[in-house]
């Protein structure tokens, strides 16, 4: 049944062209839809891709024509509309703060969604020639960390350091560029205490028995970001109910020490910071009281970001942030994925069976503000799409590796038009509030054209074929780089995608090759029913067979059910 559900989304594509399986392999290759395209992996190792993921990105800002106006519009949660992005300091450094993780467990794909989204924003700002100071924190002391450490009998700082390191490893695997600064709360207690003092001095906070609370009634703009009225507000998830508070919505800036918990000395006695004050203090320390972009998941709008605004403005009346950016949830069965709900899937669990960039491709396939429903079926589609993209570029690279283009040689008009269309669609979609799904779709036509040039008789005869291939590969490489999908080597990425497919199928390559042998023998003996069964058996677990003049090979594919439409032998 699961396999049948996986196949359902692909049946219309398969049914639309039943005759393709009978075409010669190379002709069928050029006509087949991208998600179902047969791919091949060379048995020898060609030269590595000339552009490593991060080094290529560093120069990606040169990808657009000089002097072209490229205006970025971003949806601002505070104004509830898209706005033209204009840096606070024209020509200066863009300040961007994104709320980081509380490292008390493995990070899940809800975290991946947030940090991939802001990584794309970081990359695109740099592509547009902005200098960016990107700050993403670690909340390395918190109620949840303390509770988990007590549960495991572990030091809280040791636990948070371990999970912080794991998080950084996950981010690297997902091709998220390192932020400019990654501050930890425990290293910024002095800054936090100083900000709390300023808030008290400005009559917006009060101390009770070693605790310090922010007084929301003394901040008239409270609720502007979330659109909540003060009477409707409730204390946030991490704000304990305390009858001593002047207003139930007042939240903790400083928590008095409890036995067995980490604490620091302060003017109000030993204790530790509240959740919200930490980000206000660290963002002000690294970016100043006013900066350009503050981001996070939409679950942080209230109470966390609402409280941040109140604290920062109470500490410094000139404090302001121009753009509040929030990403949507990852849902499981229409319910937000989160650790507290117990329905989360960790990044590590997913990447045991899928290439990390397949997960990134899946996340970028939906606009960052829209909810995304996590399904294995969609991961399979993303993985297949990634394989097709890398295989096309690998084929192109191998074809062009001995070719040297002459400087100034004009390209055919159709090639120039294809490249310009890709460039325009990429920039238009990305500049419209980072529509990554549209940007990804923009490479589909160039990839099809490249496959025509690589594998069809007509394409191979086209004038300046290799020059066209090289130019299109370069432009697609730029797009993949800005989206964080460019591997250091197409060939190595293809191998890794194949290894993950074998793991999902619970098979070894030797077992697949044995099945191919059995099928070849069955075909020679004209046992076509048996041959068909072997093909279907492998297709059901995501292994597609391709017959060619040099024999039968295999590639990863979207798994199909035994009842699914599979190309006949």
From Swiss-Prot:
It catalyses: tRNA(Cys) + L-cysteine + ATP = L-cysteinyl-tRNA(Cys) + AMP + diphosphate. Zn(2+) binds at residues 99, 279, 304, 308. GO terms for biological process: cristae formation; cysteinyl-tRNA aminoacylation; polar nucleus fusion; regulation of programmed cell death; regulation of translation. A motif ('HIGH' region) lies at residues 101-111. One of its GO terms (molecular function) is ATP binding. It is found in: Plastid, Chloroplast; Mitochondrion. Binds 1 zinc ion per subunit. Its EC number is 6.1.1.16. ATP binds at residue 339. Its cofactor is Zn(2+). Keywords: Aminoacyl-tRNA synthetase, ATP-binding, Chloroplast, Ligase, Metal-binding, Mitochondrion, Nucleotide-binding, Plastid, Protein biosynthesis, Transit peptide, Zinc. GO terms for cellular component: chloroplast; cytoplasm; mitochondrion. The keyword Zinc applies. Its main location: plastid. Residues 1-42 form a transit peptide. InterPro entries: Cys-tRNA-ligase, Cys-tRNA-synt_Ia_DALR, Cys-tRNA/MSH_ligase, CysS_C, Rossmann-like_a/b/a_fold, tRNA-synt_1_cat_dom, tRNAsynth_Ia_anticodon-bd. A motif ('KMSKS' region) lies at residues 336-340. HAMAP family: Cys_tRNA_synth (MF_00041). Belongs to the class-I aminoacyl-tRNA synthetase family. Nuclear genome-encoded factor required for normal assembly of chloroplast polysomes. This is Cysteine--tRNA ligase CPS1 homolog, chloroplastic/mitochondrial. It comes from Oryza sativa subsp. japonica (Rice). The lineage of its organism: Eukaryota, Viridiplantae, Streptophyta, Embryophyta, Tracheophyta.
């Amino acid at each position: 049944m699961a396999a049948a559900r996986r196949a359902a989304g692909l049946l219309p594509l398969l049914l639309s062209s039943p005759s393709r399986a009978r075409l010669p392999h190379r002709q069928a290759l050029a006509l087949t839809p991208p998600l179902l395209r047969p791919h091949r992996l060379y048995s020898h190792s060609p030269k590595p891709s000339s552009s490593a993921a991060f080094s290529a990105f560093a120069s990606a800002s040169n990808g657009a024509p000089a002097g072209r106006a490229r205006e970025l519009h971003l949806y601002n949660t505070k104004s509830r509309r898209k706005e033209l992005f204009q840096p606070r300091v024209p020509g200066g450094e863009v300040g961007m703060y994104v709320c980081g993780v509380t490292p008390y467990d493995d990070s899940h794909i809800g975290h991946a969604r947030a940090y991939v989204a802001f990584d794309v924003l970081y990359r695109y700002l740099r592509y547009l020639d902005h200098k960016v100071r990107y700050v993403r924190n670690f909340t390395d002391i918190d109620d949840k960390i303390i509770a988990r450490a007590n549960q495991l009998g572990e030091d809280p700082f040791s636990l948070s350091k371990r999970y912080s390191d794991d998080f950084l490893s996950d981010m690297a695997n997902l091709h998220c560029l390192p932020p400019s600064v990654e501050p930890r709360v425990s290293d910024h207690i002095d800054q936090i205490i100083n900000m709390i003092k300023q808030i008290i001095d400005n009559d917006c906070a009060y101390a009770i028995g070693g605790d310090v609370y922010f007084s929301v009634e003394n901040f008239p703009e409270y609720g502007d970001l979330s659109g909540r009225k003060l009477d409707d507000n409730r204390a946030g998830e991490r704000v304990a109910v305390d009858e001593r508070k002047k207003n139930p919505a007042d939240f903790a800036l400083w928590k008095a020490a409890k036995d067995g918990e980490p604490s620091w000395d302060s003017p109000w006695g030993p204790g530790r910071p509240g959740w919200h004050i930490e980000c206000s203090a660290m963002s002000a320390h690294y970016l100043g009281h006013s900066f350009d972009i503050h981001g996070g998941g939409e679950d942080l709008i209230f109470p966390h970001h609402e409280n941040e605004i109140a604290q920062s403005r109470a500490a410094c009346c000139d404090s302001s942030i121009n753009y509040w950016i929030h990403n949507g949830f990852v849902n499981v069965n229409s319910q937000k994925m989160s650790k507290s709900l117990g329905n989360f899937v960790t990044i590590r669990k997913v990447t045991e069976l899928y290439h990390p960039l397949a997960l990134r491709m899946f996340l970028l396939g939906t606009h960052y503000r829209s909810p995304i429903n996590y399904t294995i079926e969609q991961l399979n589609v993303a993985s297949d799409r990634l394989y097709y993209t890398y295989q096309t570029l690998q084929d192109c690279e191998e074809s062009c590796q001995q070719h040297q283009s002459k400087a100034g040689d004009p390209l055919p008009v159709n090639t120039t038009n294809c490249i310009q269309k890709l460039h325009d669609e990429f920039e238009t979609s990305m500049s419209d509030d980072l529509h990554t799904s549209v940007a990804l779709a923009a490479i589909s036509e160039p990839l099809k054209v490249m496959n025509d040039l690589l594998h069809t008789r007509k394409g191979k005869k086209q004038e300046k074929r290799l020059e066209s291939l090289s130019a299109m590969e370069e432009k697609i490489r730029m797009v993949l780089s800005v989206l964080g999908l460019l591997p250091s080597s197409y060939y190595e990425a293809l191998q890794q995608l194949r290894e993950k497919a074998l793991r999902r199928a619970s098979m070894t390559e030797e077992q697949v090759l044995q099945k191919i042998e059995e099928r070849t023998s069955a075909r020679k003996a004209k046992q076509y029913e048996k041959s068909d069964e072997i093909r279907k058996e492998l297709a059901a677990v995501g292994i597609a067979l391709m017959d060619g003049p040099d024999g039968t090979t295999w590639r990863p594919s979207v798994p199909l059910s035994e009842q699914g439409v599979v190309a006949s032998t």
